[in-house]
C-alpha cells in the first residue's frame, strides 16, 4: 500500500469535501456478523441509536462545525457496497470458516443504505439519533463515531502549519513505535486493532495497523476494521456487542424473558456461528448477575471478553467461575479490550501468563494517542469517551448497566429498574477517559 505523507495530507485543504467514510466496509467486523443475525431473526424490530458524549466537559457543538458534520453524514448515506467488496465478503475465509455470510444476506446487503439521521444542537452538544429498522440503524454506530472524532481532530489541527504538523506526526509515530518495542518483549502475545470508532483519522489508523504488522509480526492477529483487513491482507476480527442483549431485554415482556435475554443471544449466536466465535460478553447487565444466572452450557464456550471491569479483577472473577464449573482455565480464552494501553497490557499479560489463554483488543490508545505530541497544547487532540448506543427498541427504552456505573446508559428510571432486577453487586465505579 502506498505511503501517505500524513502532515501534508492534513495541511492540504483544497478539496470541497474530504470524505471521512469512503466505504461501508470502514466499520467493525462484528457489526456485519451481528447484522446477519439481526437480518435473519429480528427483521421487524425497530431500534434507535443515539450519540452519547461521556466527556461532557467537551462541548462538541462548539468544536465541530454543524455544516461539516452534516456534509460527512450525508456523504456516508450515499455509499453502497462495491462489487469488489461483495466478492471479498463472499469468498474470504473468516475465523477459519468459508462462506460465513449467507448468499441471501449478501444479496440484501448489496443494496443496503444508511438511513436518515436526526441532528440538533443543545447546550453545546450535538443530539444525534438514528431511527428505523434495527437492520439499518445498527450500521450507523461506527461511521458516526469515526466521523465525529475525525472532524474534531481536523478542527484541532486547522491552524497548524506544515512544519507544526510534521512535528506532531513525527512525535506521534515515535510514541507509537516505543509502544511497539515494549510489546515485542511479551512472548506469545496476541493483540489486535480495535480502534476504529474513536480513531484520530482513517489514515492514522491505517498507519498504526501497518506499524503493528511490521513491528510485532505474528503477535498482531488482525484488525476489527473490515476495510483495513481487506486492504492489508489481515484477519478481520470481532465477535458481538452489548446491543444484542440490550435490545432483547428491551423487548422482554416478562421477568423470565428479561433474565434470559443475555443467554438467548448466545443461543442465537451459536446457531449462526459457533466454533471460534463463541466468545461471551458478560457485562451488559453486570458480570456478577450474568455468572450467577448463567446456564451450565455457557462454561463450554471458548472464552469471555470482560469489557468494563478492571482487567485483572474481571479476569480473576471469570477464572474462578470456570473453576466452579469444573473447567480448566488454561484451555479457555480471555479477550481484554477496555481502555487498554501498553502499561495495562503488560500488567495484565504478566498477571495471567500461563494461567489462561489471552488476547488483547487495543482501541483508542492505539489509534488516538496524541497527548504531548503537538508543539503546543491542543485540547482537541485529547481522545474523549464518545459512544453511540441503542436507546430504544420497538418503543421500549434500552439499558446497559455495565460493571462500571460510569458507563451505564439508558433512561434513569429504567436503569434503576434493571439494577433492582439484576442487582448492583461487584460493580466498581472508575473514571472513564475513553
UniProtKB/Swiss-Prot annotation:
Listed InterPro entries: N/Namide_PRibTrfase, NAPRTase_N, Nic_PRibTrfase, Nic_PRibTrfase-Fam, Nicotinate_pribotase-like_C
A Gene Ontology biological process term: NAD biosynthetic process via the salvage pathway
Protein's pathway: Cofactor biosynthesis; NAD(+) biosynthesis; nicotinate D-ribonucleotide from nicotinate: step 1/1
Record note on modification: Transiently phosphorylated on a His residue during the reaction cycle. Phosphorylation strongly increases the affinity for substrates and increases the rate of nicotinate D-ribonucleotide production. Dephosphorylation regenerates the low-affinity form of the enzyme, leading to product release.
UniProt entry tagged with the keyword Zinc: no
Molecular-function GO term, any one: nicotinate phosphoribosyltransferase activity
Transmembrane segments: none
Keywords from the named record: Ligase, Phosphoprotein, Pyridine nucleotide biosynthesis
Reaction catalyzed: nicotinate + 5-phospho-alpha-D-ribose 1-diphosphate + ATP + H2O = nicotinate beta-D-ribonucleotide + ADP + phosphate + diphosphate
Function: Catalyzes the synthesis of beta-nicotinate D-ribonucleotide from nicotinate and 5-phospho-D-ribose 1-phosphate at the expense of ATP.
Family: Belongs to the NAPRTase family.
Protein name: Nicotinate phosphoribosyltransferase
Organism: Brucella melitensis biotype 1 (strain ATCC 23456 / CCUG 17765 / NCTC 10094 / 16M)
Lineage: Bacteria, Pseudomonadati, Pseudomonadota, Alphaproteobacteria, Hyphomicrobiales
Name of encoding gene: pncB
